[in-house]
């Protein structure tokens, strides 16, 4: 069964081909990062227009890479939500038009389910059940995953997502958009001992998290340093980046360990863009070695938004249940509302 996946929820256009017998056959991705950098953030209207420009050429490139034709497709999956309404509409329009013309099923996919299942595209693959740490620019959640569609949210951020906190803090430090990845790179050269920032809700007694207060703490620290020395020098900026990243990582790791104890699970799956963070991976790998559990990640290329995860999630939905179909988008969509298969 050959499934075409289309991702267009925000500022990446992703198209991929997944075969249930042979695995991922082709994967094409275009990022709009450079286009939005001029504005310091994602401009929804520009994002939608760029998806329109890119979706068909990327699909053609994907088919060519795999040596396939449209007539070979058995189904088409698309990101139904959550995301930017106009951007989602591009993928939904294309998927439904192609599926109608080819007389094949169309499969709406939850964007976060795509992220959750993306580590199953790696090798070795995690087995159900597992605990998932979903950590991205828009979401930070801890979930018990017992099967496709069987998700229980155990804890989540009560304000900013971890990736959002990275980007906002980078902006406070004067780093160019997108600042989160650059902040992480600068943190690698920062001193681990010079500054210490708070760990919000680390001892809250539940699995929820909070990261908005870290921005305020960084702003206070920046003002203190500027008052003492004038403009921040590069080393001070790197040291602040290090302190910020260490605070985020410690909260994510300790909350994940607590969630695993609560759920009684020995497998941890990390998904989402922040899952590519080197310090987070190192800390989780160290914890896994000490606590004797297994940790799984998607391939680095599939940590960001991509069509491969949508094609795979769509294939799983098609394999185990009738696709919902219908020309709809859901810019706001609770993952826990998905039916299990």
UniProtKB/Swiss-Prot annotation:
The top EC class, named as a word, is transferase
Molecular-function GO terms, alphabetical: iron ion binding; N(6)-L-threonylcarbamoyladenine synthase activity
GO annotations of cellular component type: cytoplasm
> Which cysteine-cysteine pairs are annotated as disulfide bonds in the entry?
none
Q: Which residues bind Fe cation?
A: 111, 115, 305
Q: Where in the cell is it found?
A: Cytoplasm
Which example biological process does GO assign this protein? tRNA threonylcarbamoyladenosine modification
Keyword annotations for this protein, in alphabetical order, are:
Acyltransferase, Cytoplasm, Iron, Metal-binding, Transferase, tRNA processing
Q: Which HAMAP family match?
A: TsaD
Function recorded in the entry: Required for the formation of a threonylcarbamoyl group on adenosine at position 37 (t(6)A37) in tRNAs that read codons beginning with adenine. Is involved in the transfer of the threonylcarbamoyl moiety of threonylcarbamoyl-AMP (TC-AMP) to the N6 group of A37, together with TsaE and TsaB. TsaD likely plays a direct catalytic role in this reaction.
Q: What is this protein called?
A: tRNA N6-adenosine threonylcarbamoyltransferase
Source organism per UniProt: Chromobacterium violaceum (strain ATCC 12472 / DSM 30191 / JCM 1249 / CCUG 213 / NBRC 12614 / NCIMB 9131 / NCTC 9757 / MK)
Q: What is the lineage of its organism?
A: Bacteria, Pseudomonadati, Pseudomonadota, Betaproteobacteria, Neisseriales
